[in-house]
Amino acid sequence: MDFNQVKVINHPLIQHKLTIMRKKETSTVKFRTLMHEVSMLLAYEVTRDLEIEYEEIETPLATMQSPVLKGKKLVFVSILRAGNGLLDGMLQLVPTARIGHIGLYRDPKTLEAVEYYFKLPEHTQDRDVIVVDPMLATGNSAIAAVKEVKALHPKSIKFLCLLAAPEGISNFHGEHPDVPIFTAAIDEQLNDHGYIVPGLGDAGDRLYGTKLAH
């Protein structure tokens, strides 16, 4: 597997919070809070290479050339529903970002992604886009979502998740070798139900307090 396009974010705070999220006894409220906190930290890393330019400003003491973000506003694209759990923290860091949603569910028999909703901001072309979903398991949902985003010709695309499985990384980069993956951890494997092991369960169910269904 080629990991040149995979960035594992090993920040101690992220890893500590992720450990608590993994624990089966962690409550929905705590899980949701941690998701918010971790998403802010992940957003800091995934936006590290944004372009800047300089503008002249006046401080109380002098005039100076100071850096600001260059170009159009970012677009965050959430893969529903669990992707929404990452948005609040990211928006706290980048409040001017535009938001898109792609609704996909995983067919329980085939594990293929089925689209039921698609709405992205106007003028997504020429913008930097970050597609978010907590789990990169089989990779099918991420593959489908990024394909839709590519059709709009953005300036760049990144994929951000909490956990990734080796199978998901391989499948994703088999279809989108040009799109970098940012993740907090790469786990061992998928089980027969397509869940990441050891993982943290179903991120959407744990985030919204719904029952895990196999």
From Swiss-Prot:
Listed pathway(s): Pyrimidine metabolism; UMP biosynthesis via salvage pathway; UMP from uracil: step 1/1
Coiled coil: none
UniProt signal peptide: none
Taxonomy, superkingdom: Bacteria
Molecular function in Gene Ontology: GTP binding; magnesium ion binding; uracil phosphoribosyltransferase activity
Sorted UniProt keywords: Allosteric enzyme, Glycosyltransferase, GTP-binding, Magnesium, Nucleotide-binding, Transferase
Cofactor: Mg(2+)
InterPro entries recorded: PRibTrfase_dom (IPR000836), PRTase-like (IPR029057), Upp_B (IPR034332), UPRTase/APRTase (IPR050054), Ura_phspho_trans (IPR005765)
Positions that bind 5-phospho-alpha-D-ribose 1-diphosphate: 81, 106, 133-141, 202
Substrates-to-products reaction catalysed: UMP + diphosphate = 5-phospho-alpha-D-ribose 1-diphosphate + uracil
Enzyme Commission numbers on file: 2.4.2.9
Cofactor note: Binds 1 Mg(2+) ion per subunit. The magnesium is bound as Mg-PRPP.
Regulation of this protein's activity per its record: Allosterically activated by GTP.
EC top class named in words: transferase
One record GO biological process: uracil salvage
Membrane-traversing stretches: none
Entry keyword Acyltransferase: no
Entry keyword Transferase: yes
UniProt xrefs under HAMAP family: Upp_B
Family membership: Belongs to the UPRTase family.
Function recorded in the entry: Catalyzes the conversion of uracil and 5-phospho-alpha-D-ribose 1-diphosphate (PRPP) to UMP and diphosphate.
Name of the protein in question: Uracil phosphoribosyltransferase
Organism (species): Legionella pneumophila (strain Lens)
Gene that produces this protein: upp
